[in-house]
A protein has these predicted regions:
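Short, solvent-exposed mixed-charge patches
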Residues: 184-185
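SH3/SH3-like beta-barrel superfamily modules
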Residues: 70-106, 142-174
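Mature extracytoplasmic/lumenal regions of exported proteins
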Residues: 94, 100-123
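Residue patterns forming the tRNA-binding/recognition surfaces of aminoacyl-tRNA synthetases
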Residues: 177-179
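Beta-loop motif signature
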Residues: 20-86, 114-153
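Sec-dependent N-terminal signal peptides
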Residues: 1-16
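Surface-exposed flexible segments
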Residues: 59, 107-111, 173-175
């Protein structure tokens, strides 16, 4: 009995571990035009019970009860795209991080799983007055709002180029993303 319990605990470790932020899931509710009024992304708790549904509604904002833009990596309302940190379970299910919790993503609607770094390198970032940028030696305080393309990403930091200097900005703290900074170009 103890041996069976130990095996079950070891097999479930990837699901109950802190997880990684090396992948993101990009959910498309609109692709040129709305995918359809029945475009549904279902989020299940790890025990299989329903957590929430993200639905496309023809001509309107997507509907969901418990998921808001602060629970995702990014939300692009003009394009109707949600982005979540994700990982694959040992049974090949896609798990997405909604806030601080992992949920099972179940859908027949289009979505893409990408390495987080590849996703970030396709974006611009908005830097605001008072933001702190770092290089090898200095801290630089942003004096006016600027938008720069992301040229590198490592962990919680992304790099931008300003006046031929590679400067780093902290875009997230662990799984908490600084909202409304990542811009889809």
């Amino acid at each position: 009995m103890k041996k069976t319990l130990l095996i079950l605990i070891i097999l479930s470790l990837p699901l109950i571990s802190k997880g990684s932020d090396n992948l993101v899931a990009v959910l498309y509710l609109k692709n040129g035009s709305y995918v359809s009024s029945d475009s549904v992304y279902t989020f299940l708790n790890l025990d299989g019970t329903l957590f929430d549904e993200l639905r496309s509604r023809n001509g309107n904002e997507p509907t969901c009860l418990k998921i808001d833009r602060d629970n995702s990596v990014s939300y692009y309302p003009d394009l109707m795209i949600y982005v979540f940190f994700c990982k694959l379970s040992p049974t090949r299910k896609v798990l997405v991080r909604v806030g601080h919790d992992w949920k099972i993503l179940k859908t027949n609607s289009p979505f893409t799983v990408l390495p987080t770094k590849r996703y970030l390198l396709s974006l611009d970032i908005q830097l605001r007055v008072g933001d702190i940028l770092y290089d090898k030696r200095d801290k630089v305080k942003v004096k006016r709002c600027i938008i720069r393309h992301i040229i590198d990403a490592r962990g919680d930091y992304v790099a931008v180029e300003i006046k031929k200097r590679k400067l780093w900005f902290r875009w997230k703290r662990h799984y908490q993303v600084i909202p409304d900074r990542l811009l889809y170009n």
